[in-house]
UniProtKB/Swiss-Prot annotation:
SUPFAM superfamilies documented for this protein: ARM repeat
Role of this protein: Involved in programmed apoptosis and necrosis. Required for the cell corpse engulfment process. Has roles in the formation of actin halos and distal tip cell migration. Negatively regulates the unc-6/Netrin receptor unc-5 to control distal tip cell migration along the anterior-posterior axis of the body. Plays no role in amphid axon outgrowth.
Motif SH3-binding: chain residues: 715-718
Entry keyword set: Apoptosis, Cytoplasm, Lipid-binding, Phagocytosis, SH3-binding
Pfam family, one: PH_12
PROSITE patterns for this protein: ELMO
Native source species: Caenorhabditis elegans
Keyword DNA-binding in record: no
Name of the protein described by the UniProt record: Cell death abnormality protein 12
Domain ELMO: from-to ranges: 339-485
Free-text note regarding domains: The PH domain binds phosphatidylinositol 3,5-biphosphate, phosphatidylinositol 4-phosphate and phosphatidylinositol 3,4,5-trisphosphate in vitro. Required for punctate localization in the cytoplasm and cell corpse engulfment. Required for distal cell tip migration.
Quaternary data: Interacts with psr-1. Forms a ternary complex with ced-2 and ced-5.
Gene coding for it: ced-12
GO cellular component: cytoplasm; guanyl-nucleotide exchange factor complex; plasma membrane
Length: 731
């Protein structure tokens, strides 16, 4: 009977755990008894158990007791739970981050870890044990649970005493690990323990590791000390002043030359932080001047700017650019002296310059934004390159009147260009691209200024500029400089000058043309322009259709196809669409030139409605260029138009009219024009191409009047109104 009972549908059962319930494994720490000497693991203890945690109801203490009970361990001892990746102690705060499938380690509590570390470091007998203890502290230095236990059961003074201890300094591993652990703990800023907590004598000990006063110098120790000193400079004004006193910036130069790029970068970063955070302007100026030395430039070149054309470290470039900004800020930009101004005026010996213009130049030089920097660059150019100056002036004098530049205004404008590249004046600087050049030259600003003067002279000549176009030429010169610097990394001033000589005004025009085409293509593919294009397309298609029909109404001469391949006389006929666009008139003619108005007997009129189909039918004419002087005739491709008339009573398949021409454009327009008249849906390549060309022309003309925002230009922020209450009340 049971076999014949009806089937009962089973309902699916959800066996998944609720979201607040997670299940995983717990294993016993192999080093459990090392960190807790009093703990005893019984023989019947289970080393791995599976537990289920209710995250809503259970706290950490409940989970620890449950795990210990499941493992047959004594619940009297204090335990901790540790996650492996990342390695950290589980607390009530991060317990909710556990998911199903977790694997935790039942270990000694954070307090036991700290007490054992403190015992080992306090005894100080076994360097190997001390290294392992500090290594463990370093591993957990970013774990708030263990750091809180460290501050509760021990103190930072323990680590400070290690840094002061000369015996510890002999072990580079112990010292570097201790510095890293201390740095991470202070960076974590648990409680009131921050970088302000470091005492003066510890700062002195760390400074000695950098300045060369320490007995030994090791890469990892040096790296950790440099990083900590920078944090002390940034973190607090008091520790900053201690660093500025204990660490002369000159002692950091030798670290920039290290083969280990990490040390060089940390040394540069510390230099920049010391200069940036220095509260006294006079002291900051002294720090900057200490870097204007040849050993520093050589150190940067040998370590961070080595040749080879490889990809530069972006962090290194950022640090070097900041160094250069500091060096540039120390440039002498105060107003030049009267003697310096007069020296510049004496260089311009042209008799055509009036006294009034000289006074104006004198005033402009004295008020120039670059001050003495501009005056020194001009004088240096005249003194170091007198032959170049004579050549420039002699070429300039040979130009027609009105097409010459004036030396001093040209020099001042070139100084403006160099100042913008160096960020002496507001603008878009190119320090990152000039960085190798800047560190390869003792006086980079005058050297780059000289290159700009030569480029300005060449561009003026190539543009055929006139007297009032100084600003126009200057804008082109600035763009030329930016493009040359963008193309590749330049190693020195000589290479910059050589690259500028090969970069003409015509090359700049080609770049502008390509950029303009690129911008137009981007604009043409924007969503707004695509929508406008779809709206304009019907109008353009109608214009092209009318244009093709008008072309047909003008008429054209075609060759008649020949039935035989003999050298018979070629026959031609003239096809023309009438004004009503309803009839095609075909007239025979004697040659390729049709004469309008001549009476002919062989005239035929074909109604457009009688045309069934229009197709192309090309053929090869092997007699087109044959003559009695050639042994073999050449070939010519003739484009054919095949007009299929509708069937009549006389002809079942309909008559076929053929017209041949060597003009491909004429053939395509007639073919597509007739197809349009009879309503054929054949592919219209010429029509579509012309529609696209006209659409692009129309869109580009319309976009000429659209002002596009430049992403590099910052919008002008209006000033706050004087009476802001009344302004707000209006809205």
């Amino acid at each position: 009977m049971a076999f014949h009972m009806p089937l009962k549908e089973l309902q699916p059962v959800d066996t998944s755990l609720p979201e607040h319930v997670v299940k995983g494994a717990v294993v016993i720490d192999k080093e459990f008894t090392i960190w807790n000497h009093r703990a005893v693991i019984p023989s019947n203890a289970l080393h791995t158990v599976f537990i289920t945690i209710n995250l809503l109801e259970q706290k950490l203490t409940d989970v620890v007791k449950m795990a210990a009970r499941s493992m047959n361990l004594s619940e009297d001892d204090s335990y901790g739970l540790m996650a492996d990746k990342p390695k950290r102690f589980i607390t009530d705060d991060n317990l909710n981050s556990l998911g199903s499938g977790f694997i935790l380690t039942l270990c000694a509590s954070p307090d036991h870890y700290v007490k054992r570390i403190t015992e080992i470091l306090t005894e100080g007998n076994n360097i190997s044990q001390m290294e392992n203890a500090v290594k463990t502290l370093d591993e957990f230095s970013l774990d708030p649970a263990l750091i809180e236990a460290f501050y509760r059961c021990s103190s930072l003074e323990l680590l400070f005493s290690l840094i002061r201890d000369d015996r510890v300094c002999m072990s580079s591993t112990l010292l570097s690990t201790c510095l890293r652990a201390l740095s991470s703990m202070l960076e974590l800023a648990v409680g009131d323990f921050t970088w302000k907590s470091v005492p003066n004598d510890v700062v002195v000990s760390m400074a000695s590791l950098v300045t060369g006063k320490a007995k030994r110098e090791e890469a990892n120790t040096l790296l950790a000390a440099l990083q900590m000193l920078e944090q002390l400079v940034i973190g607090d004004d008091t520790t900053r002043d201690w660093i500025l006193e204990e660490v002369p910036i000159e002692t950091l130069i030798r670290h920039v030359e290290k083969s280990d790029e990490r040390i060089a970068l940390c040394a540069l970063s510390l230099m920049n932080s010391m200069i940036r955070r220095c509260p006294d302007d006079e002291k900051r100026f002294e720090l900057i001047k200490s870097l204007e030395v040849v050993p520093f430039r050589n150190a940067v070149h040998s370590s961070l700017l080595r040749g080879g054309g490889g990809v530069r470290n972006l962090n290194a470039i950022e640090q070097l650019v900041e160094v250069q900004r500091s060096l540039i800020s120390a440039y002498e930009t105060s107003p030049p002296t009267d003697a310096e101004v007069q020296k510049i005026l004496d260089i311009e010996s042209s008799e055509d310059v009036s006294e009034e213009i000289r006074e104006m130049w004198k005033s402009q030089i004295g008020e120039h934004r670059c001050g003495r920097l501009a005056a020194i660059s001009m004088v240096q150019f005249a003194e170091k390159s007198p032959q170049d100056l004579r050549m420039l002036i002699s070429e300039n004098t040979m130009r027609i009147e009105g097409g010459k530049w004036q030396l001093i205004p040209m020099w001042m404008r070139c100084c403006d260009i160099a100042a913008e590249l160096f960020r002496v004046i507001p603008g878009r600087d190119e320090l990152d691209r000039l960085i190798v050049v800047l560190f390869s030259t003792e006086t980079p600003f005058p050297a780059v200024f000289a290159c700009i003067v030569h480029l300005f002279h060449r561009t003026w000549r190539e543009m055929q500029a006139k007297g009032g176009e100084m600003e126009k030429v200057a804008c082109v010169v600035l763009e030329q400089l930016r493009h040359v610097l963008k193309r590749r990394e330049i190693q020195d001033v000589e290479e910059l000058s050589a690259d500028l000589e090969t970069f003409s005004y015509r090359a700049m025009q080609e770049i502008w043309r390509e950029e303009q085409l690129g911008k137009e293509n981007i604009q043409l593919h924007s969503e707004a322009v695509i929508q406008l294009k779809s709206k304009l397309r019907p109008k353009m298609e109608e214009l092209v259709r009318i244009n093709h029909l008008n072309y047909l109404k003008l008429g054209a001469v075609f060759r008649k196809p020949q039935k035989s391949k003999s050298l018979a006389k070629l026959a031609f006929w003239h096809w023309k669409l009438d004004a009503s666009e309803k009839m095609l008139t075909i007239t025979g003619c004697d040659g390729e030139n049709y004469v309008e108005g001549v009476q002919r007997d062989d005239i035929r009129q074909v109604w457009i409605k009688d045309i069934a189909d229009v197709t192309n039918n090309d053929e090869i004419d092997r007699k087109a260029s044959s003559s009695r002087f050639t042994s073999s005739p050449s070939t010519q491709m003739l484009r054919g138009i095949r007009v299929q008339l509708k069937t009549t009573n006389d002809m079942k398949e309909g008559e076929v009219l053929m017209a041949l021409t060597s003009d491909e454009t004429q053939s395509v327009i007639w073919l597509e024009g007739l197809a349009e008249l009879i309503g054929s849906k054949a592919v219209k390549s010429e029509t579509d191409a012309m529609v696209e060309r006209m659409l692009k022309m129309e869109l580009r003309v319309r976009l000429l009047n659209v002002k596009l925002t430049n992403p590099e230009e910052k919008p002008e922020i209006p000033p706050i109104p004087d009476d802001i209450k009344s302004f707000i009340s209006k809205f």
